[in-house]
């Protein structure tokens, strides 16, 4: 991955420009899409039709040159394509008007393909009991703002607290963990970022370095199968920013990560009975990203 392929780089640039210009031109929400030119909506790893008609399923597409770059290290081969994603929209009803209203207020999230359900709310008064509810949206709207929203000047002595919840796609992998990605504008005018592991499946404990051990791996590459014997079908947590500085503009978004499952290349190798080169990944960890919640100092 290249630095500016991450949405957080644009989000951080937005904070910096807002400090300079008084407006944030990169205050955007997140959605996922197929990014394909085939008119095919399929995004499943076992049903990947490629990005255009020249790379539809066939035994050699994994080694086709999709984009030839002057510098060979930036040339994109067929196996480097990723199957598309979906847009999740929290609309009040299933109408064109309500869906576009939700998109306008950025109450949206992206997935890399699975149909996960993800909720993300920020506020000043959430507590641990709120993470025990079966209706996170009810407490989220009552005490905070949803994904895409804004938190204004912090009450004295308080740090922003978030409710984040995710439910797995019933046809996909269990959930590995939920992370919150934070970006902020430092005192020196430069932007910074940090990724926090907030809640996870299984009996794991962060190490001395603060990093959470991997969830494990049940993928059988030869058969292109996996088992949901690790991870969790749903996760929910209440999290407070431990590094909050009320004077610094910031954004927060949630990232939900699945356990490892077979990548489209594994399905293709099985389907056509072929062997790909050793550098071709056969596994993936699907994920979802919410629109951010922004904090603006008074």
Predicted regions and their residues:
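C-terminal functional module detector
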Residues: 1-298
